[in-house]
Amino acid sequence: MFEQEDEWISKTQMKKQMNDLQDLGMALTKLSNDTLKKIGLDADLYEAVTAYKKITSNGALKRQAQFIGRLMRDTDPAPIEAFLAKLRGDDAAHNAFLQRVEQARVRLLADDGALTQFMSDFPHADAGKLRTLIRNTKKEQEQNKPPKNFRALFQELKTVMENGDAEI
């Protein structure tokens, strides 16, 4: 008895899958080269995407887009989709992490004792740098200056919490 291993896919479904992959490839063309390097694309796909950015002729752009779609068929789209979702802010876990960082910043600015608690949770953090950023942020807010240190404090907390093991 003959058993078919693969599930039958209609021609319409195959075309839709190929168009979806090509659209995903086109999303890659909108990213900077530095961001593309972070994704860890296949060398051929990376070259095709960077070449697409340099092309000005409409016909050549269409051919290159189809070539990118062809290369995408040989590539696992899941990591690329996850990376793009993270860039767009669709990643729920990443959003939850950013909210925890924001809550930590609010606590540190509101309560002077919060820094001690934060340092016990993240002993590898630079207490002096955090203390300075907190002091400068409070001074900034009192003087209604642009939130330069407010943002710097967020970035520092984000870095510390990304590298730390404890949950805040």
From Swiss-Prot:
Main location group: cytoplasm
Subcellular location: Cytoplasm
Keywords: Cytoplasm, Ribosome biogenesis, RNA-binding, rRNA-binding
Pfam families: DarP
GO cellular component, one term: cytoplasm
Single biological process term from Gene Ontology: assembly of large subunit precursor of preribosome
GO molecular function, one term: rRNA binding
Signal peptide: none
Alphabetical list of InterPro entries matching this protein: DarP, DarP_sf
Family assignment from sequence similarity: Belongs to the DarP family.
NCBIfam families linked: PRK05255.1-1
Functional note: Member of a network of 50S ribosomal subunit biogenesis factors which assembles along the 30S-50S interface, preventing incorrect 23S rRNA structures from forming. Promotes peptidyl transferase center (PTC) maturation.
Protein name (database record): Dual-action ribosomal maturation protein DarP
